[in-house]
């Protein structure tokens, strides 16, 4: 289950209710027809943004309607009798086909290409974990093949600052890109993932390093222009 209205489509109560209605329809259908295995794509937005180190045992404590929506839909999925459920909670995902243009690799590469500059929130001090969409897909396939259930955070375990990420994006253009810092409006927050459970489940999995992933997406992007 991947369908959802993301924050760029709305952050209000009306959007929340539309997303819950989607899940209600899915649950109603599965209650009638049954299902051998349900994989629900949630979000790391279910965790409190103040929590700096996250594991699957970190209590869910969403701080906005988007996070609350995903956590509610997780509960709805788990309420289905006799349906094995896996909840995946991905960190920030990047890739060529991104439609959200969220702050990070996706926005930075587009800004660099269009404007020749990348603007950061503050000095880009915050650290976040970013995962290439191909890794998300590959891990999902493994979960399906293993009939995995429970909850799994989908992250690399390596966090970098947004300034570092901007430098990686700028490097793809031969460092001709200006990186602009701005006055900080909000406190600096950090987030790191302990991916011990993921490594135990798939010990042979190798993530695409952020530097390699951004370079790959850049090549794909330039190939389209």
Predicted regions and their residues:
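NAD(P)H-binding glycine-rich loop region in Rossmannoid oxidoreductase-like domains
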Residues: 1-18
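NAD(P)-dependent short-chain dehydrogenase/reductase
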Residues: 75-128, 133
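Active-site helix of classical SDR
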Residues: 65, 69-72
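C-terminal substrate-binding subdomain of Rossmann-fold SDR/epimerase-dehydratase oxidoreductases
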Residues: 116, 121-225
């Amino acid at each position: 289950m991947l369908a959802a209205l993301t924050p760029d489509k709305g952050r209000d109560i009306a959007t929340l209710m539309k997303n819950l209605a989607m899940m209600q329809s899915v649950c109603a259908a599965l209650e009638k027809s049954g299902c051998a295995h349900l994989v629900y794509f949630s979000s790391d937005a279910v965790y409190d943004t103040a929590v700096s180190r996250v594991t699957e045992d970190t209590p869910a404590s969403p701080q906005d309607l988007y996070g609350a929506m995903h956590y509610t839909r997780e509960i709805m999925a788990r309420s289905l009798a006799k349906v094995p459920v896996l909840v995946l909670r991905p960190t920030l995902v990047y890739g060529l086909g991104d439609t959200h243009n969220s702050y990070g690799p996706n926005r930075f590469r587009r800004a660099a290409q269009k404007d020749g500059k990348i603007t950061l929130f503050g000095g880009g001090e915050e650290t976040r974990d970013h995962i290439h969409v191909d890794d998300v897909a590959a891990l999902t396939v493994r979960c399906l093949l293993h009939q995995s259930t429970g909850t799994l955070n989908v992250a690399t375990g390596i966090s970098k600052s947004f300034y570092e990420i901007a430098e990686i994006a700028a490097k793809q253009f031969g460092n001709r890109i200006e990186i602009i810092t701005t006055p900080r409006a909000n406190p600096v927050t950090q987030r790191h993932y302990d991916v011990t459970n993921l490594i135990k489940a798939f010990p042979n999995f190798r993530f695409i390093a952020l530097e390699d992933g951004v370079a790959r997406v850049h090549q794909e992007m330039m190939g389209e222009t």
